[in-house]
From Swiss-Prot:
NCBIfam families: nickel pincer cofactor biosynthesis protein LarC. It comes from Acetivibrio thermocellus (strain ATCC 27405 / DSM 1237 / JCM 9322 / NBRC 103400 / NCIMB 10682 / NRRL B-4536 / VPI 7372) (Clostridium thermocellum). It catalyses: Ni(II)-pyridinium-3,5-bisthiocarboxylate mononucleotide = pyridinium-3,5-bisthiocarboxylate mononucleotide + Ni(2+). It comes from the Bacteria. Belongs to the LarC family. Coiled coil: none annotated. GO terms for molecular function: lyase activity; nickel cation binding. Keywords: Lyase, Nickel. This is Pyridinium-3,5-bisthiocarboxylic acid mononucleotide nickel insertion protein. One of its GO terms (biological process) is protein maturation. Involved in the biosynthesis of a nickel-pincer cofactor ((SCS)Ni(II) pincer complex). Binds Ni(2+), and functions in nickel delivery to pyridinium-3,5-bisthiocarboxylic acid mononucleotide (P2TMN), to form the mature cofactor. Is thus probably required for the activation of nickel-pincer cofactor-dependent enzymes. Its EC number is 4.99.1.12.
Amino acid sequence: MRILYFDCFAGASGDMILGALLDLGIDVGIFKRELAGLNLDGFDIAVEKKVINSIAVTDVNVIVKEECNHHTGHHHHCERNLADIEKIIDESSLKDNVKRLSKKIFSEIARAEAKVHNKSIEDVHFHEVGAIDSIVDIVGTAICLDLLKVDKIYSSPMHDGTGFIECQHGKLPVPVPAVLEMLKESNIPYITEDVNTELLTPTGLGIIKCVASKFGPMPPMTIEKVGYGAGKRQTGRFNALRCILGNAKEKEKIDDEICMLETNIDDMNPEILGYVMNRLFENGALDVFYTPVYMKKNRPGVLLTVLTDKEHEEKLVDIILTETTTLGIRKTTAQRYVLEREIKHVNTEFGKIRVKESSFGDYKKYSPEFEDCKKVAQELKIPLSKVYDAVNKAILVFEERNENALQ
């Protein structure tokens, strides 16, 4: 399992996160081509190596050519609300998963800003976050995570300084109110450093909060790459954020956190329920199932249960609320143990077919990939069971004789 760990010993900001991710070895040319899909004019991005405290780091600078320039080409003051930013993202040619994550991060920051300024989330205007450089930091981070193809993201506790900083709202205490709002009622551990300035920005915390599934020490893993992203402030210490990329040290059961969405339905056409299930799976649900239940007034109905990770939760909630007759959804956070899984290929008389390998210590088990077997059965017009038999036979050859059937 490929793991990314954010080591935020000196806090976190958007440019530090982006710099550390690029420092892991992402091709800057490919990154810039992906970023061009944002279709946002008026800026250049400079990515260069520098040295801080004798350590090589990557420094990212977004160079704004004009005071502000919307994607339409018209000039505006650099204050955008959430709808403005979502419109830019929706009208871009970015990948769908990059769009979803970018909007999720902006929504998290907007929620915090709206709360501290006593405004609705629709009325709050971004200043720092609405500026081009912060948009690039957030969307750029989503692009990097897509390019890295990690399975799990973890983070250290969040670190911040003390004192006051000057910003568009005047002189504010550190941590700034939006940061405290995002930390409130979260499971994110927070540490105050003896540094008289801001270390943790709303953009930095918003990104980490939305992508990390756990906070704490680095999990056991073999380290593949380490990246450092430069901070801009002079803090009197090594001001950088570190990203560590690696693989799970052992192929064992993984303690995983998921969200369970449930709702009871007794007034829907069952044909539509089947359609809803397909849509939920297509949009990232880990599992979807219906359970027969008896509801009030002795009505037979179904309990719809959807298992999802954090990344896809919001989209799946939208689908349930728009596609079904329900008026509400119950949400439960659950822990689960999962065997690590890898896709392998097995050589059969019908050619190579994928199998799922799951591991627990030295114990391994294999299961044929249904879609591959179905495709072979349909193309060759043979029983599906015959394809399964061929795959299972090849697996036995590998296990019993240790031949090179799996690659």
